[in-house]
């Protein structure tokens, strides 16, 4: 049976967007839906590595991250007196066998906005402010039931494959009743992203301070941003 779309991607964050663009680049007929109108405007991920840049290079989109990212000098584990325990140095200009720097730090709202623009210019069909309602198996394909969140209109279409890129609380996973593996890590962290107003002398390396009283992490995010992460203790 001929379906309306070859692949439907649920969730258009960076993972869903890049999946859609890569499929479209291979002449796959793609529908992407997301329940939100706009990208999430707070930073979450901050790091992209050489393999990620290599994937973007296939789409000629590596500039999105290169123009919005900063290289770092290394990454270290420090004790509570800031003495180095272990880590790696990253020499300036060092390239891996993939032809890119091993890691760069970016500001996600910048890069996500540019990826969204690329998606909307592509041959992918896109429905925003549209929520997945149900996935109904029909032989060798699925009927995707959706609802427009602005006017309540329900729209259904057929697809050969479905990609669930809708995050930790994935509706695709819940509908399909897929198991979620729990790695039993239940610690909460306070993540503080700071936009600097003036030049600073903060180090250009990432560090985790292994203080037994409170573990914390410092990330020299893409200028003018910096990130600190603090583990929350019991009762906090």
Explain the meaning of each model-derived region.
Residues 128-143:
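A conserved short coil-to-beta-strand element within the FAD-binding core of flavoproteins
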Residues 117, 161, 165-236:
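Conserved FAD-binding catalytic core of PHBH/FMO-like flavoproteins
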Residues 13-14, 39, 167:
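Residue-level detector of alpha-helix initiation sites
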Residues 3-5, 151-161:
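Core beta-strand elements of the Rossmann-like FAD/NAD(P) dinucleotide-binding domain
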Residues 9, 20, 56, 111-115, ...:
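Conserved structural-core and active-site-/substrate-pathway-adjacent residues in large, well-folded domains
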Residues 3-32:
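N-terminal Rossmann-like FAD-binding beta1-loop-alpha1 element of flavoenzymes
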Residues 44, 49-120, 209, 219-221:
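Active-site-adjacent segment of FAD-dependent monooxygenases/related oxidoreductases
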């Amino acid at each position: 049976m001929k379906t309306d779309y070859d692949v439907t991607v649920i969730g258009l964050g960076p993972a869903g967007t890049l999946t859609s663009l890569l499929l479209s680049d291979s002449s796959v007929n793609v529908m992407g839906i997301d329940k939100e109108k706009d990208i999430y405007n707070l930073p979450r991920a901050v790091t992209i590595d050489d393999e990620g840049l290599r994937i973007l290079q296939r789409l000629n989109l590596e500039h999105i991250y290169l123009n919005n990212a900063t290289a770092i000098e290394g990454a270290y584990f420090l004790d509570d007196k800031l003495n180095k325990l272990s880590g790696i140095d990253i020499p300036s200009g060092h390239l891996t066998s993939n032809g890119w720097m091993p890691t760069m730090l970016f500001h996600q709202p910048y890069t996500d906005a540019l990826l969204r623009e690329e998606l909307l210019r592509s041959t992918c069909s896109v429905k925003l402010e549209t929520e997945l309602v149900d996935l109904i198996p029909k032989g060798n394909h699925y009927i995707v039931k959706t609802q427009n969140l602005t006017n309540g209109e329900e729209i259904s279409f057929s697809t050969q494959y479905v990609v669930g890129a809708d995050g930790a609380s994935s509706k695709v996973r819940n509908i399909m009743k897929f198991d979620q593996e729990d790695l039993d890590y239940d610690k909460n962290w306070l993540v503080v992203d700071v936009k600097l107003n003036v030049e600073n002398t903060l180090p250009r390396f990432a560090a985790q301070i292994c203080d037994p009283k409170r573990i914390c992490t410092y990330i020299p995010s893409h200028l003018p941003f910096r990130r600190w992460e603090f583990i929350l203790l019991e009762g906090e």
